[in-house]
Amino acid sequence: MDIRAAEISAILKEQIKNFGKEAEVSEVGQVLSVGDGIARVYGLDNVQAGEMVEFPGGIRGMALNLESDNVGVVIFGADRDIKEGDVVKRTGAIVDVPVGPELLGRVVDALGNPIDGKGPIKAKERRRVDVKAPGIIPRKSVHEPMSTGLKAIDALIPVGRGQRELVIGDRQTGKTAIILDTFLNQKPIHDNGPDKDKLYCVYVAVGQKRSTVAQFVKVLEERGALEYSIVVAATASDPAPMQYLAPFAGCAMGEYFRDNGQHALIGYDDLSKQAVAYRQMSLLLRRPPGREAYPGDVFYLHSRLLERAAKLNDENGAGSLTALPVIETQGNDVSAFIPTNVISITDGQIFLETNLFYQGIRPAVNVGLSVSRVGSSAQIKAMKQVAGSIKGELAQYREMAAFAQFGSDLDAATQRLLNRGARLTELLKQPQFSPLKTEEQVAVIYAGVNGYLDKLAVNQVGKFEEGLLASLRTEHKDVLEGICNEKALTDDLKAKLKAAIDAFAKSFA
């Protein structure tokens, strides 16, 4: 067998030419111990705080505790398949999620992976989950209304675009229902409104039952609201790190719209469960516990999340991100640690009460304890004109109602006040899934504060309202359109509205 030198050298040259010049360098560590969703890893000397690391089998984790001799890693997934001595790789990337309009209409987990079975998400952009909130200079004070469609809120506790309004109450008081109705109320704007007014919705479910989240998504889908919404779900069966991360992931998705000159609304449901998940992680990482065994930085956990909701000024695109965080209280105790923290961070709270809920006053908003620190700058002029007096009348009614229990012989003025108050309270009730446009709310409240309900029996108020709205929508469209376009009750509009209500009141009697 003759060996041709030229041939061998040609083959060798060819092989050398194709030889991979780049060796893959990856910094690795070893698992020292693992359990309860936490791994202690030796090595990984240059790992960054919050960096993603990879375990065998594609399981991911996040480096949270950087200690002198090891790294504490929280695991996003089951820790059953991870054992002592396993090799852990750095990925070099801080935790990020896909963002953009491609996510609208989808249900994703805390890392942005789709969990709705509708195929992969082809997002063009990714963002870090934990970024710094906008500073003072890029912001602008809140001045545009974010309409919820609920009379009790839009009239008395108005929420503006870029505001953070806490929804707080015991379990089963209708907190999620307020967020759901607010999402549904954006449908008319998405169908017919200008692009600049459209409000994209993000719902973050933390530690909830899967059936509850499925029900929420089903309602959005049936009512055509899923097409402008994103649902981020970290349910009760998900690991604590996912429940901790979900609000930050949802916030990053909402910030995409805020930073592109659009408007977004995010509901965190609920932050009490996020705090519990964070407490679990912190205690397992052996961080020192503080009040109620929460770690010392649980205030910072919520403040850095909620500070990212902002209204940006015109130089920065004039976008906004409005936050509706939810907190669940135990036995109406708003003085517990997490509720007081979040109340002090947010720009007001909507306080829901169990006994109001069981009295049939739904939404069960306690108007006396609820406030909006942005106030009437988040209302259109027409709403300010009619809602100004309803606040005062309801406050007087609550005060009088407390005294009226003792005395039987009340003077006529007090009796009148109590009658009016009872009817206004009835007027502010609203069934679920039936949000009203702002101009319709203005018309209804105008009828209430101008004495049209005083002669009616309390149980007739709802019927009167339904009939009045039906009459306005069919025969007096021009009045509603006028309020919508003018955004104020001019003398001319007031006269038209008064005539329309007078005509209806005659036929109703």
UniProtKB/Swiss-Prot annotation:
A GO CC annotation given for this chain: plasma membrane
EC number: 7.1.2.2
The reaction(s) this protein catalyses: ATP + H2O + 4 H(+)(in) = ADP + phosphate + 5 H(+)(out)
InterPro entries in UniProt: ATP_synth_asu-like_sf (IPR023366), ATP_synth_asu_C (IPR000793), ATP_synth_asu_C_sf (IPR038376), ATP_synth_F1_a_nt-bd_dom (IPR033732), ATP_synth_F1_asu (IPR005294), ATPase_a/bsu_AS (IPR020003), ATPase_F1/V1/A1_a/bsu_N (IPR004100), ATPase_F1/V1/A1_a/bsu_N_sf (IPR036121)
Domain of life: Bacteria
Main location: membrane
Keywords carried by this UniProt record: ATP synthesis, ATP-binding, Cell inner membrane, Cell membrane, CF(1), Hydrogen ion transport, Ion transport, Membrane, Nucleotide-binding, Translocase, Transport
CDD domains: ATP-synt_F1_alpha_C, ATP-synt_F1_alpha_N, F1-ATPase_alpha_CD
GO molecular function: ADP binding; ATP binding; proton-transporting ATP synthase activity, rotational mechanism
Topology class, membrane: Peripheral membrane protein
Function per UniProt: Produces ATP from ADP in the presence of a proton gradient across the membrane. The alpha chain is a regulatory subunit.
Family: Belongs to the ATPase alpha/beta chains family.
Protein name, UniProt field: ATP synthase subunit alpha
The species this protein was found in: Brucella melitensis biotype 2 (strain ATCC 23457)
